[in-house]
Amino acid sequence: MMQRYRILLLSLLFLAAPLAAEAQVPTFEEVAGHAFGERITQAYQMQQYLQAVADASDRVVVEQIGTSWQGRPLMHAIVTSPENHARLDAIKANAQRLGDPRGLSDTDAERLFNEQPAIFWYGGSIHGFELSGTEGGLKMLERLTTQDDADTQRILENTVVIIDPILNPDGRDAFAYHNHDRVGQEANPDNQDWSNDFTSWEALKYRTSHYFFDINRDWFAHTHRETQARVPVLQEWRPQAGIDAHEMGANVEFYVDPPTDPVGPFFPNYATEWFERFGEAHAQGFDARGVDYMTRERFNYFYPAYTTSYLSYQGAVGMLYEQGSSRGLALTRPDGTVRTLEDALMNQYTAFEAALVLTANEREALLRDYVAAHRDAIADGEQGTRRYVLPADGGDPLMIAEVVNLLQRSGVEVNRLTAEASLRGVTDRNGDSVGNRTFAAGSYVIDAAQPRNRFIRVMLEPEVPVPQDFLEEARARVDRAENPRFYDITAWSLPLLYGIEGFSSTDGRGLASQRVEEPVTPEQPTFARAQYAYLIDGTQAAGLPALIHLKKQGYRVALLQHGTRIQGQDYAAGTGIVYAGQAEDSVHDDVRDVADRYALSVSGVNTGLAEGDRPSLGSGDVIYLKEPSVAMLAEEPIQPYSFGWAWFTLDQQYELPVSMLRVPSLRSANLSEYDTIIVPEIYGTGAMERLAGADGLERLARWVRDGGTLVTLGSGTEVARHLELIALRSWYDEEEHADSLRVSVPGAMVATSLDRNHWLAAGVPEGFRGLTNSNRLYLAPEGAPSPRQRAGVTYASGNDFAYSGHMWQESEERLPGAVFAYEERVGSGRVIAFAEDINFRAYYRGGNRLFLNAVLAGPSAP
């Protein structure tokens, strides 16, 4: 629940002649103890300033909306006139009506166009060490609470401004500590000064969240607390416009929208049209101050989970500010001039001011276009694809629930079938027509004719086509060995990411269904007390971590490599076994507890005997699991994003402990304490050898040969190849390919082929798609697979090869049949190598089971 700081006696609202705002409200310097730009404002100072302003001003309400992973407050200030504050609940209710104009009469609409202030949201410094966005937002808060000029009064009367100054307090404070520990009496603008210098690992730490996540890529998935706190705010207020204030490299001064290509086909025209108007206002503000700026370069909104693109798909004009960095307090630019933090924050402030003045002056036009855009979105949903369906039996129930819940959090209306329904014109999640299909009661239905239509389509369509003109330009850049400028992945369809079934239909007939009003949890059938064993659903990724938690409690647990049938019920490959026959009486309650914890489906059986020739529960087909001790390499030259994704997956999503080993510690650490060591993506084997030393890497190789399980992710696989632990070949190593152009796949979801006789594929859903985001091409050793050298997952080939997203022709020709996941036995140990990062952003949930199999079952596998 939001913690609210309501700050004024109501009588102050009705003073006939209020004192000047300047006399009532403290300045930023009076509270923080430094002027803007003198030091880096930390999260606690932001909190103190917001509360002090709210205590003194009738223009401000402050809310704490959550906490970061490290416990820092997530706060925003709601700024508007005292008169608007007196009717704030009505303004908020009217914002909902404008954001959902179904049932809004023309008369009521006209009244709201006349009375309703525009809602404007500002988010500062989502990348922690991009400092000026926070400072510029706080400076605007100071202006709006201490000044009474005509523009300020108009902004307060015609807008409600929500200023969220620090979107990423953990990253920001980490950088503030770095800088403040190293700065002298005066800021040193020398780029090599230690206050301005840091390693690539440190840079990502200061940019990202506690778990090394780029929160500016998390807006549709909401994996992080920071995102989870902000999404309800946007749903509650339905802003017409918003700003995401960033920094970029030092070579240029300022970027404002309109953005560059590509623009996706579902992107709202409302945002595109208003980009031009806001862009002109920004230009006028910068021209008046003589500030250099650029537009339509570098930054695009094709990917839907940037702050800006998410805002736009949610119905607002989501705008990006990119200020040239001052690194810390001052930095020397390539031309020899110095940019200070004060310079940078003034540019952010200037742009913010221009946007607010335009919003206040054009309030009615903005509201009219906003409502028209939502009516257009609803009308669009009444043609073409009419609805999307997530079948009740379409995969891991926990993953289905997560998709439904993230859609609901983003304002999407979801219904659930109360009776079986047959639909015509059905297309599956791969974009293939399946004609008519019947969906069971309990399936989830998302109708397209609703206000969040654009967001629904961009998240649930199998493919979001990249515009052809952009592809032609990108191809020319590839041929010149330049960056093609995709800027992010090109496939993110939720059914593909989460490994569940999904369908769309052109059938708009009425269905027997009921609105889903609350977050959903998978249904868990009760299970009887078992005499022999408890069997955990093999299709659920969390089943394997559940086994490890039960193993930790002292129970005997195992994993089925292949499916079986016991007492008339089928059990899939990957099914977990908890033996009850010789266990403590508490086993039933402990299994029930872990089932509740992970929303698992469990059955109790009174015999281990399988029907027919299926494997029984004591057969050689069963993998008896140990409780593995897991470590992961950390710091230089490990790629921090990859490290963070794996850490978050294990620590947060499955509550599994992992020890972090700094790469240089390979020379001295007692590796025998670990059963599994994870190597995330790396910056290069040369850096790895330099930091670990030849002796450290040899100790790692010896640990594998002595029985350890090494799990390598993406470029981390090069470590295993460098140490000659695996015979996996790179396509580019082949003599005939040595001069071939290296082309990357920009984040496509690619069809795969699973070796169902390999334990690594146990429990992995059918139709698994490999998220591919590199130019790596690995080939299995020549000759037939052997028990010691096997590819558990390869990219599909022939007619089965398919993908969502973009891929160049070279990749279409080279990728089929290449390795995605590979195992090689080395001495008494093994290497499990992934060609790509299987934990991508922790929202690639369809890959979880593969990763968990490797990490948790690898040490016990045959």
Label for each model-derived stretch:
Residues 8-18:
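Bacterial N-terminal signal peptides
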Residues 1-9:
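Bacterial N-terminal signal peptides that target proteins for export
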Residues 193-213:
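Aromatic- and acidic-residue-enriched carbohydrate-binding clefts of CAZyme catalytic domains
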Residues 165-169, 179, 245-252, 715-716:
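Short, solvent-exposed turn/loop segments enriched in Gly/Ser/Thr/Pro and often Arg
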Residues 24-131, 138-162, 211, 217-218, ...:
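Intrinsic-disorder/low-complexity accessory segments
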Residues 141, 158-180:
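Carboxylate/His-rich catalytic cores and anion/metal-binding grooves
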Residues 177-200, 220, 224-227, 239, ...:
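Active-site cavity-forming subdomains of large catalytic enzyme subunits
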Residues 19-23:
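Sec/Tat signal peptide C-region and signal peptidase I cleavage site
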